[in-house]
């Protein structure tokens, strides 16, 4: 069953745009935008299952230069 989620990202100071740009090139990330507020970037992702979501967040998103913290909200 496909899984869709929003990844809320806190980035290093001045890195929001480059983080969003880097994330937009990651397979599974449908869109990523710098935003204002508590989080600096919001990404929308779609993957085939929860295991792939976990891998995407831990191995692809959290390793992008400038990413400090992530919070994942799975769409229901």
Segments predicted by a language model, with ranges:
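A compositional/biophysical signature of low hydrophobicity enriched in polar/charged and small residues
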Residues: 1-76
């Amino acid at each position: 069953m496909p899984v869709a989620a929003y990844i809320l990202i806190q980035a290093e100071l001045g890195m929001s745009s480059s983080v969003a740009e880097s994330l937009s090139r990651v397979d599974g990330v449908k869109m990523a935008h710098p935003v204002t507020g508590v989080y600096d970037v919001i990404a929308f992702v779609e993957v085939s299952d929860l295991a792939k979501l976990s891998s995407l967040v831990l191995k692809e998103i959290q390793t992008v230069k400038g990413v400090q913290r992530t919070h994942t909200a799975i769409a229901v």
